Design a protein with these regions (language model features):
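Short aromatic-enriched loop/helix-cap "lid" or pocket-rim segments at secondary-structure transitions
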Residues: 92-95, 117, 179-183, 234-237, ...
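Hydrophobic alpha-helix immediately C-terminal to the catalytic Tyr-X-X-X-Lys motif of short-chain
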Residues: 205, 209, 213, 243, ...
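Structural element of the ATP-grasp superfamily
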Residues: 156, 210, 243, 336-337
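Amphipathic alpha-helical recognition patches that constitute DNA-binding helices
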Residues: 62, 197, 231, 238, ...
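C-terminal substrate-binding subdomain of Rossmann-fold SDR/epimerase-dehydratase oxidoreductases
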Residues: 31, 38, 44-47, 54-55, ...
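N-terminal Rossmann-like NAD(P)+-binding domain of SDR-like oxidoreductases, especially those catalyzing
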Residues: 2-229, 359-365, 369, 373-383
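Residues in well-ordered alpha-helical elements
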Residues: 114-117, 136, 143, 154, ...
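The catalytic Tyr-centered alpha-helix of NAD(P)H-dependent dehydrogenases
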Residues: 184, 195-202, 232, 236-240, ...
Length: 383
């Protein structure tokens, strides 16, 4: 099978010059959807859903591309169409090497209603990963977050409603706000929404749109809210890869504030497997929280990275904290485990961290082009 070329000039591109999108048409199986399932009655156990053609929005981003790889590697009968705008965080290289008879890349904007009208009816389900996700960037310039996260979700829901296609909406635990460091509570599916940043407020808005369209129009949707991800193909602006690549460059890592902020960490492979279980076995209209019980403070994670890379545990610099920096996230994923039997497999955080360090050490050509510009943005914000 021929792989996807990271820079595919020879692919057939539909639309002439001035076309609103570029479609890299790779050989694939059937051209149309493989069938539409009947919505489950509210509250009933879900029948097994077997999609043959999936549209993954944001499929060249971190979470989206890892999910695409998971599908290709574990579900051989499924064809994936990736829709991605290829912003700074979405790159062709993230899906390079995947079989061209299984994966098709369409370059375009999630807010393009006409494009969605072409793509959505061709698939059995949409897995909606497209989002702007970096908190610091949302504080500096919220507008792209409103455009992609809110308007983009609205446009997608309208296409899903028009064409009767199932939607798997991917979201974050940040919509719930934060918990006190000494609070033993964890977020559940019933926790109230209290977003505290421009980013999390746009994701909360997108979740609410999904719920409203589901109730009003009877859409077949599921929502998942996941804890912090780490693993391969994560942009260097994010906490773990930023620290790793700074150490590789001989630069002292930077820690916001007192570093006691707690996050629940999950390997992106485990997130991908949970996303698939919810897509194929989750009950329509339901929300599922995804987490791996990996709560750790930022300072503990940074020290673990430093020690694993042969540095002193305190070989870092403190920088001013981010405005409104949430203190603690913690997820109770018992519903997902109880109803769908899902369990994380990357339960040794030290081992997962080591593999992530090794990946960045061996993939410098992947992250190097974005490093200087990323650090320049951080420096401009005093961080």
């Amino acid at each position: 099978m021929a792989p996807i070329d990271p820079d595919p000039p020879d692919f057939g591109v539909s639309g002439g010059s001035g076309s609103r999108f570029s479609r890299f048409q790779l050989p694939c199986g059937s051209a149309g959807p493989s069938g539409v399932t009947v919505p489950e009655p509210e509250g009933s156990a879900a029948a097994h859903f077997n999609p043959k053609i999936i549209l993954v929005t944001g499929g060249c981003g971190f979470i989206g591309s890892n999910f695409v790889r998971h599908v290709v590697e574990n579900h051989p009968g499924v064809h994936v169409t990736v829709l991605d705008k290829l912003t700074y965080a979405g790159r062709r290289e993230n899906i390079a090497g995947l079989p061209s008879d299984r994966v098709e890349l369409v370059v375009g904007d999630i807010c393009d209603a006409g494009l969605l009208d072409e793509l959505v009816p061709e698939c059995d389900a949409v897995v909606h990963c497209a989002a702007e996700t970096h908190n610091d960037s949302s504080i500096a310039d919220p507008e792209p977050f409103l455009h992609t996260n809110v308007e983009g979700t609205f446009r997608l829901l309208e296409a899903v409603r028009k064409h009767g296609v199932r939607c798997r909406h991917v979201s974050t635990d940040e919509v719930y706000g934060d918990l006190a460091l000494d609070d033993p509570a964890r977020f559940t599916e019933e926790s109230p929404y209290r977003p505290s940043s421009p980013y999390s407020s746009t994701k909360a808005s997108s979740d609410m749109l999904v719920r409203a369209w589901t109730r009003t129009y009877g859409l077949r949707t599921t929502i998942s809210n996941c804890s912090n991800n780490y693993g391969p193909y994560q942009h260097v602006e994010k906490f773990i890869p930023r620290q790793i690549t700074n150490i590789i460059d001989g630069v002292r890592p930077k820690l916001y504030g007192d570093g006691r902020n707690v996050r629940g960490w999950i390997h992106v492979d485990d997130h991908s497997s949970a996303m698939w279980e919810i897509l194929t076995r989750g009950r329509c209209g339901e929300t599922y929280l995804i987490g791996a019980d990996g709560e750790r403070s930022n300072i503990d994670v940074l020290r673990a990275i430093l020690v694993a890379m042969g540095k002193g545990a305190d070989d870092f610099d403190r920088v001013p904290d981010r405005p409104g920096h949430d203190r603690r996230y913690a997820i109770d994923a018992s519903k997902l485990r109880r109803e769908l039997g899902w369990r994380p497999t990357h339960t040794d955080f030290s081992e997962g961290l080591r593999s992530t360090i090794d990946w960045n050490l061996t993939h410098e050509p992947w992250w190097r082009p974005a490093k200087a510009a990323t650090e320049a943005r951080y420096a401009g914000r005093g961080r």
